[in-house]
Amino acid sequence: MAATFFSGFKDEQSALAFLLEQIYEGFQMQSSICVVLKDEKYFDEFKKAQQQKYFEKGKIEYLYDKNISLLDSKPADEFDEIHILSDKVLELPTNVCENVYVYTTKANEGITKASRELYANLKKNNFDLSHQAV
């Protein structure tokens, strides 16, 4: 079980654009992917970012989302990957996923604070943790 924390995004748009780049491989492998977003505004921004990536890259995969579950709370089902840009996930059960990716922005202190608490809880559960400043 591994978790990677990405920090340093100036706003949610830049975090969502990076998140889409990260899950692009999941589209290819048909992985089951969970994306936990803060609220309805973030859901709308995610959909806009998908379309923007499609127009930038010209790859239809950015519009395919049948293997993506969009949630606004802690996931209960098992997934191949979980991507979190939310202040509502403070812990995860060890059986829910092998690969967790957490994104924080300078613009949202609530998400940053929640990710710190999630980091501490995942460490207690023996996740292999890494951090990348973007």
What do the PLM-derived regions correspond to, one by one?
Residues 1-15:
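Glycine-rich phosphate-binding "P-loop"
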Residues 57-72, 129-134:
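A generic structural motif
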Residues 64-100:
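Mid-chain, well-packed structural core segment of small domains
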Residues 8, 36-40, 84-88, 105-107:
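Structural motif
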Residues 45-46, 93-94, 112:
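Short glycine-/acidic-enriched loop or helix-start segments at secondary-structure transitions
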Residues 16-64:
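Short, well-structured hydrophobic secondary-structure segments
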Residues 3, 32-34, 81:
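Residue-level preference for the first positions of well-ordered beta-strands
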Residues 99-134:
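Glycine-rich, aromatic-bearing surface loops/beta-hairpins
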